[in-house]
């Protein structure tokens, strides 16, 4: 069986945070079932970074994304360098997977691109 990468759905943070997380067994992709019925496993969000955190050990980092509909954290474990060039106030085009741990929905980054002009076509 060939495993295909799911397309990242361009969405709002509120679509993710207001949905219901569905965990599937095995290698099937977990997803958030949005209120409109859309399955969100990989998402693409245009947002502003409002907070950045790096643990003392340097093995965990997180940013908080805000797109004016809601906020959500993106977390990196061990591969924290992905957040190095980013600062609070930066506008980013974020692609990542939706995950849930202990009731908190969060994103795991795959691609983060700083945006100079949010009016440019993405």
Describe the role of every protein-language-model region.
Residues 1-122:
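OB-fold and OB-like single-stranded nucleic-acid-recognition modules
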């Amino acid at each position: 069986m060939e495993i295909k990468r799911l397309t990242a759905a361009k969405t709002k943070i509120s679509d993710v945070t207001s949905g219901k997380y569905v965990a599937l067994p095995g290698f099937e992709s977990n997803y958030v079932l949005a209120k409109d019925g859309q399955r969100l496993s990989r998402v693409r969000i245009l947002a502003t970074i409002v907070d950045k955190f790096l643990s003392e050990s340097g093995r965990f980092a997180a940013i908080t994304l805000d797109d004016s509909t809601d906020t959500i954290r993106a977390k990196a474990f061990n591969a924290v360098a992905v957040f190095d060039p980013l600062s609070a106030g930066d506008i980013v085009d974020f692609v990542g997977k939706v995950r849930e741990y202990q009731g908190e929905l969060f994103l795991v980054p795959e691609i983060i691109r700083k945006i100079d002009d949010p009016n440019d076509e993405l």
